[in-house]
A protein has these predicted regions:
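Aromatic-rich peripheral "rim/lid" segments of glycoside hydrolase catalytic domains that contact
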Residues: 96, 103, 182, 204, ...
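Extracellular beta-strand elements of beta-rich domains used
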Residues: 4, 19-23, 84, 212, ...
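Short, acidic/polar
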Residues: 60-78, 187-193, 276-287, 314, ...
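Extracellular beta-strand ligand-recognition surfaces/modules
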Residues: 1-21, 198
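Acidic-and-aromatic substrate-binding clefts and catalytic sites of carbohydrate-active enzymes
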Residues: 29, 55-70, 95, 125-132, ...
Length: 405
């Protein structure tokens, strides 16, 4: 069976029409590969990286639909990876209901649901959190012996604009005092919910989620933010954002309350990291200026070879992050190439992976004991990638490995 999916920019509710569709076979096709016969990525790197992961979707849509509910995909993930990251279903936009599905509940009702309402929260209502996909994914992890990266708590994109307004009404921007309380409510509630769910499923909090992306892409905060967003409330604090530091502190305190601060790592995550490495290091140093609450740096690594970045620049960036002594993880790896050639992509991806492996094996363990603890490939195959030009290890599906695999 085949599913053809169309979408247009803008409102997901807009109607549109197709005049005609023509499907043309341009080649005679390739032999179908049984994915069960392929070598395992996680086994290949098991003595180098603790985690080898992919991103996936529990519900999803189009080519991404039901990835964690289909037997063939589940078996593929179990064989190839030991970690998953939800691509979108744990981002604030989804958890808060997006721009159109906001639901407010009373503080009393929220407390009955286990939400953490801080003393400085003075509003009568809070947003009801949609954690269905998160819970289902945790259940998937428990059933299939797979761990999870939690992505993400704070981002200037994919967070509904009404979250930053008075009374959640989508109009006037809220005050910093109001947002401080909302931030604390959201961060503490998210961590507590996940840890409670872990305990329910496995008997132990901290047993499934090993890393949280607390803040995503702050260095690129001016890049297409939701309007309004964090900067509209707090202003531009450059590389000393008080509210980002607070988010890490809230999250760290929740880990401390469960004795998990040494088992679960809080990450700062960003893209184009090889062009802003010094800023990222400065930001993380600020976050940790009072106490080491940020334990890791996430390198998204959305690459375009051979020049963005060059292998040498990528290696230099790894050196800078490893020198901080913090854990480093490659969190969203995909690699296009300017030529759009499969062999060129394979060569570039090979060089990137060889660089990551070399840096991990040859690091100064007295400076960075753990080093690079994980690599996550951002997607299962090209047709479900957010990027257009052959960025992943498989082409049309899990039975279609590319030379880069």
């Amino acid at each position: 069976d085949y599913l053809i999916y169309f979408e247009i920019p803008g409102s997901a509710k807009a109607d549109f029409y197709l005049d005609s569709v023509v499907i043309t076979q341009v080649s005679k096709g390739k032999d179908v590969i049984d994915p069960n016969t392929l070598a395992s990525i996680k086994d290949t790197y098991k003595n180098i990286f603790q985690y080898m992961g992919t991103c996936a979707n529990y519900y999803g849509y189009g080519a991404k639909k039901d990835q964690l509910r289909k037997d063939d995909t589940i078996n593929f993930i179990k064989k190839q990876f030991n970690s998953i990251t939800l691509e979108n279903e744990m981002k604030p936009d989804t958890v808060l209901g997006g721009f159109y599905n906001k639901k407010l509940i009373s503080v009393d009702e929220a407390k009955k649901l286990g939400y953490i309402i801080p003393d400085n929260y003075k509003e009568d209502e809070v947003p009801q959190l949609d954690l269905g996909a998160v819970d289902a994914t945790l259940e998937f992890c428990a059933e299939n012996n797979v761990k999870m990266r939690a992505h993400t708590l704070m981002w200037h994109q994919q967070t509904p604009s009404w979250f930053f307004t008075e009374d959640y009404n989508g109009k006037n921007v809220a005050t910093t005092e109001v947002m401080d309380a909302r931030l604390e409510f959201f961060v503490r509630t998210m961590l507590n919910h996940v840890m409670d769910k872990e305990k329910e499923l496995t008997g132990k909090a901290g047993s499934l989620v090993y890393a949280w992306d607390v803040t995503n892409e702050y260095v690129h905060r001016a890049n297409e933010p939701t309007s309004p967003s964090w900067m509209d409330v707090y202003g531009d604090m450059d590389l000393e954002p008080v509210y980002v530091k607070k988010a890490f502190t809230f999250a760290y305190e929740e880990l401390e309350n469960r004795g998990l601060q040494d088992q679960v790592t809080l990450f700062y995550n960003d893209y184009d990291e090889y062009n802003c490495a010094d800023k990222i290091v400065e930001l993380v140093n600020y976050i940790n200026s009072d106490k080491k609450v940020c334990g890791g740096i996430g390198m998204q690594s959305h690459l375009t070879g051979p020049e963005n970045p060059t292998i040498d620049l990528y290696a230099e960036t790894l050196d800078k992050f490893l020198a901080t002594g913090l854990e480093v993880q490659v969190t969203e790896l995909d690699a296009e190439v300017e030529s759009n050639d499969l062999e060129d992509q394979a060569a570039y991806m090979k060089s990137i992976m060889e660089t990551i492996v070399t840096k991990q094996l040859n690091r100064d363990k007295t400076v960075n004991p753990k080093g690079i603890t994980g690599v996550t490939i951002w997607g299962l195959y090209d047709t479900c990638s957010w990027r257009k030009n052959i960025p992943l290890l498989f082409a049309s599906g899990i039975n279609d490995p590319k030379p880069s695999f």
